[in-house]
Amino acid sequence: MPAENKKVRFENTTSDKGKIPSKVIKSYYGTMDIKKINEGLLDSKILSAFNTVIALLGSIVIIVMNIMIIQNYTRSTDNQAVIKDALQGIQQQIKGLADKIGTEIGPKVSLIDTSSTITIPANIGLLGSKISQSTASINENVNEKCKFTLPPLKIHECNISCPNPLPFREYRPQTEGVSNLVGLPNNICLQKTSNQILKPKLISYTLPVVGQSGTCITDPLLAMDEGYFAYSHLERIGSCSRGVSKQRIIGVGEVLDRGDEVPSLFMTNVWTPPNPNTVYHCSAVYNNEFYYVLCAVSTVGDPILNSTYWSGSLMMTRLAVKPKSNGGGYNQHQLALRSIEKGRYDKVMPYGPSGIKQGDTLYFPAVGFLVRTEFKYNDSNCPITKCQYSKPENCRLSMGIRPNSHYILRSGLLKYNLSDGENPKVVFIEISDQRLSIGSPSKIYDSLGQPVFYQASFSWDTMIKFGDVLTVNPLVVNWRNNTVISRPGQSQCPRFNTCPEICWEGVYNDAFLIDRINWISAGVFLDSNQTAENPVFTVFKDNEILYRAQLASEDTNAQKTITNCFLLKNKIWCISLVEIYDTGDNVIRPKLFAVKIPEQCT
């Protein structure tokens, strides 16, 4: 796709540029950082990083001096053996220096970057929020007791000299009143209405980035469970699809009510992988105050696009949502994967934002790479009876990213048992053949007492694909027959297409079930026929859209959307992450919207 094209072609790769809309929604969203800021510890780490830099500079000076000595020596002698030994010594010094840069400088520079861009802004924002809440409470008391009205305190307009803010050391966020959707149905509007009853609220949040113009924030992940969340993104400079990978953020935290009865997020623990350009397609599952994050590791680029050359390596990281001071391996821990049981598949990897736990077992959404010649499918099962131009072989040929690709892709789950002890492994479980389409990003989550599975529509079956999980192993889904939600598309697979064709295009826009009796769900979808634009928060049934709210202007480009719904003080709320092009600098960045599901239809 041409970089200069302002419309986003609806393809499976992130486009380089979006258009600058006429209407810009201002916000800064991302991740608040570590709630415990130990100022002395922070200073000591920064000092340690500074000392390391000085030591490395000294090493460089010594190496340069050695080279100068050798140059002088070569002018006065022909002893090539001595010169060779000296050069080998310098090579060893350079290798040691490079190793030290990778193992010592990189992480400490990342520490400084994280501290300056996440920790300090997060706690200043939190302190300001607490001050605003306190002053509002004081005003209410004075107004009630004294029978006159105090003007609101405008913190940023006070003509006083304010001291530098101290770290908010004593704050301990607690997840109160936040829970999963369980039990009996909640009271929500069940009727179709054109009234603007949805009131999306942009969550004001500080992005954990350097913030320079042109930084593209892509490949976002947002998982939520039991009042805790995991978040991840990749930063690129120069281009959203081919730019230089600067850093990947993987963090966890709590869903909070900051005093205004609107859910927000407070990040408590952040990890930045040392090699961000090798980490792809992370997925997170919560269990007992930890998030387990499973990622693909690749040195040849995206494993989906470079599957033939990808080694199949995976990485598991455990992050504590309530980290301890000096917690070390408790707070952030790399888990060894002794084996990967792939069955008949060549390679497998996580593919989708989040999964579920059942007892001691974690299930991550995944995709398997199967050699095309080993894929057995009866073409007579291809649903073409109502399609005039579709061919029986189209179902089979559309299972790869190209008709002649070496691998076909199948969705499924990766199972990880926490009780495996010293021999941890992941096991791939493939999805059943019913309503089969190419493997794509998916999500499995618990809602109202039963797991629900969503799979992105990346091929000819463009209608939303989700339903109750009947069995996990093997993975069998009772797919809903939805007729109102579809994704934009071009070529052979346009919006609302249901005839088997050979294509590979689509986007991840999941839905969260909020009422099981009436099968009502909520999510953000792109209300456009051909281009990825116009994100709209929508509450819908299988055959009817009940009510909706636009999150940006109609021509605002957007892509991936992730929605998680939960109870906050017995009210249904949803938080939606939206990849969106409306920041004013021609790059895509995610935003968070909080939406309360209304009880009344008026």
UniProtKB/Swiss-Prot annotation:
Transmembrane segments: 50-70
Intravirion side: 1-49
GO biological process entries: clathrin-dependent endocytosis of virus by host cell; membrane fusion involved in viral entry into host cell; virion attachment to host cell
Effect caused by changing residue 327 to D: In strain: Isolate NiV/KHM/CSUR38
Swiss-Prot/TrEMBL keywords: Clathrin-mediated endocytosis of virus by host, Disulfide bond, Glycoprotein, Hemagglutinin, Host cell membrane, Host membrane, Host-virus interaction, Membrane, Signal-anchor, Transmembrane, Transmembrane helix, Viral attachment to host cell, Viral attachment to host entry receptor, Viral envelope protein, Viral penetration into host cytoplasm, Virion, Virus endocytosis by host, Virus entry into host cell
Primary site of residence: virion
GO CC field: host cell plasma membrane; membrane; viral envelope; virion membrane
Sugar-bearing residue positions: 72, 159, 306, 378, 417, 481, 529
Matches recorded under InterPro entries: Hemagglutn-neuramid, Hemagglutn/HN, Sialidase_sf
Coiled coil: none
Keyword Transmembrane set for record: yes
Disulfide-bond pairs as recorded: 189-601, 216-240, 282-295, 382-395, 387-499, 493-503, 565-574
Membrane topology qualifier: Single-pass type II membrane protein
Stretches in topological domain Virion surface: 71-602
Post-translational modification (record): N-glycosylated.
Domain remark from Swiss-Prot or TrEMBL: The N-terminus four-helix bundle form the stalk and the C-terminus form the receptor binding globular head domain.
Subunit and interaction comment: Homotetramer; disulfide-linked. Interacts with host EFNB2; this interaction allows the virus entry into the host cell. Interacts with host EFNB3; this interaction allows the virus entry into the host cell. Interacts with the fusion glycoprotein; this interaction involves both head and stalk regions of glygoprotein G.
Family label: Belongs to the paramyxoviruses hemagglutinin-neuraminidase family.
Function summary: Interacts with host ephrinB2/EFNB2 or ephrin B3/EFNB3 to provide virion attachment to target cell. This attachment induces virion internalization predominantly through clathrin-mediated endocytosis.
Protein's name in the database: Glycoprotein G
Organism this protein belongs to: Nipah virus
